[in-house]
């Protein structure tokens, strides 16, 4: 297989039909592929990024029309559930891990750290409260952090030594190149190259669980369920 970097400078007119379409795609995505590969990002993540990049440049928005959304009209009352369901739930706790999506910064609230570190009550942050809840239920707590939230969030969890005796406290989501809106090319910021990258969003959890080894680690230790929510 020819690496896409070798295709730069090749005249697409030598190809026809589907070949030319493929060639155009390879040329337009090559700057992203090369940048991500140089950063050591795994192939499965690069392929996922390119999949959605191709949708972007083809005009797809990813939006769901409001007319296609139907509101929930009735929610079951947990107090009405039969007792055997509660017993099943209690037994399942020993096979359940809590994963909190913790990649976002609180810049809009004046915080240059993870939003979960914002103090909310009596000096406790959201993450403090989450850690207390995890300790009370005796379930492992894992954070999906971004490269911007990892260090500060783990420093806070050091206050809770009883968390996760046999599992890591976090795994990292990937990073992806920012895209210019005017020409769909990677953003260039030589003065601060870190500003050329951004987190890919919550949907990266599926890829990050695999590439970080977290999914394999959870399965090896007998966990079957994950409760996933924002931090």
Regions found by a protein language model. Give the residues of each.
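Conserved phosphate/anionic-ligand binding catalytic regions in large, soluble enzymes, centered on
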Residues: 102-108
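Polar low-complexity intrinsically disordered regions
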Residues: 1-2, 165
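Domain-scale recognition of functional cores that engage charged ligands
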Residues: 74-97, 108-231
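Low-complexity, highly charged intrinsically disordered N-terminal segments
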Residues: 2-90
């Amino acid at each position: 297989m020819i690496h896409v970097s070798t295709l730069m400078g090749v005249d697409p007119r030598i190809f026809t039909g589907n070949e030319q379409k493929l060639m155009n795609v390879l040329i337009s995505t090559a700057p992203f592929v090369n940048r991500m590969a140089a950063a050591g990002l795994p192939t499965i993540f690069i392929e996922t990024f390119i999949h959605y990049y191709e949708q972007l440049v083809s005009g797809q928005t990813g939006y769901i029309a409001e007319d296609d959304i139907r509101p929930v009209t009735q929610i079951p009352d947990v107090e009405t559930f039969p007792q055997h369901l509660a017993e099943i739930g209690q037994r399942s706790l020993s096979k359940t891990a809590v994963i909190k999506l913790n990649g976002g910064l609180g810049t809009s609230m004046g915080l240059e750290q993870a939003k979960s570190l914002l103090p909310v009550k009596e000096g406790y942050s959201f993450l403090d409260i989450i850690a207390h809840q995890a300790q009370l239920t005796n379930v492992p707590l894992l954070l999906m952090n971004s490269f911007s939230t990892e260090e500060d969030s783990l420093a806070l969890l050091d206050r809770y030594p009883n968390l996760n005796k046999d599992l890591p406290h976090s795994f990292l989501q990937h990073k992806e190149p920012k895209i210019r809106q005017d020409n769909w090319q990677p953003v260039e910021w030589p003065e601060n190259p870190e500003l050329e990258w951004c987190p890919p969003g919550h949907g990266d959890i599926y890829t990050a669980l695999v590439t970080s080894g977290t999914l394999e680690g959870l399965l090896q230790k007998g966990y079957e369920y994950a409760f996933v929510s924002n931090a």
